[in-house]
UniProtKB/Swiss-Prot annotation:
It catalyses: Endonucleolytic cleavage of RNA, removing extra 3' nucleotides from tRNA precursor, generating 3' termini of tRNAs. A 3'-hydroxy group is left at the tRNA terminus and a 5'-phosphoryl group is left at the trailer molecule. It comes from Acaryochloris marina (strain MBIC 11017). HAMAP family: RNase_Z_BN (MF_01818). Belongs to the RNase Z family. This is Ribonuclease Z. It is an enzyme of class 3 (hydrolase). Its cofactor is Zn(2+). Binds 2 Zn(2+) ions. Homodimer. Keywords: Endonuclease, Hydrolase, Metal-binding, Nuclease, tRNA processing, Zinc. Zinc phosphodiesterase, which displays some tRNA 3'-processing endonuclease activity. Probably involved in tRNA maturation, by removing a 3'-trailer from precursor tRNA. The active site is at D66. Zn(2+) 2 binds at D66, H67, D210, H268. Its EC number is 3.1.26.11.
Amino acid sequence: MQITFLGTSSGVPTRSRNVSSVALRLPQRAEIWLFDCGEGTQHQLLRSELKSSQLRRIFITHMHGDHIFGLMGLLASCGLAGNTERIDIYGPAGLEEYLQACRRYSQTHFSYPIQVHTVQPGEVFSDQDYSVVCAPLKHRVPAFGYRIQECDRPGRFDTDKAISMGIPAGPLYGRLKRGERITLPDGRTFFGQDFCGPKEIGRKIAYCTDTIYCPEAVELSRDADVVIHESTFSHQEAELAYQRLHSTSTMAAQVAQAAGAKKLFLTHFSPRYAPNSATGLQELLTEASAIFPHTELAYDFLNYQVPRRTLTTA
């Protein structure tokens, strides 16, 4: 699981930061999932090492332009590039109507299937490898945060040990990998736990934007390996944050701390914190780190490989 930040500015792009978008790369299944798609996201994809041909799912938090204005252009370009794979899009009410209007007035026709899912609190996607749940956040328009949960996996299977015990290869290996008990024709019994390394605990990622501090963000971030949380304002601008229902750096840190998360990335920075401004982003990092030390500032094209868990590190 690799996270790539494609846009880390709020409201409008700056010279060094595009508006909101985060990509999650799942190399074991050759897929990319996108979270928000602000204007210019397809340009950011082209500048990154990611392949838009692997795009399979897009999760939209809310209907503000800095989170959706790049969506139609990206989908149209995928079609022009010859994409044939279905893309599933998840988001709040109004998203499907927005895309339908864009298609109708621009006379855009897709050569591949698109499925739009209007989300409700709870699970929005699951398969044998991952699940995604959403919860309402506290913003000026309906907004949802997302939690990506990787399913637990058995530890590495010791094939050499199984061979040395005279266990024939085939379906019995699969049963042992799943932790089951098997009995051979000669009466010997073996337990899967004796042939597998430490269990790999599924990794968790929380994506919370746009929102002020709220209990739902804490629950989405509970025990997360990575929390990606908006930090539009510094603590000095807390009154403005309450007025506009955005988070300060300290609010984001309080979410991560209350949730028992392992790492926090701040993103969605107001352009007022541009280089050479009176208050810089380093100040936001200092504020957050005083509460939650494992905090980093996200920047465009930052890649982060989410480390695997085992029973000893969970």
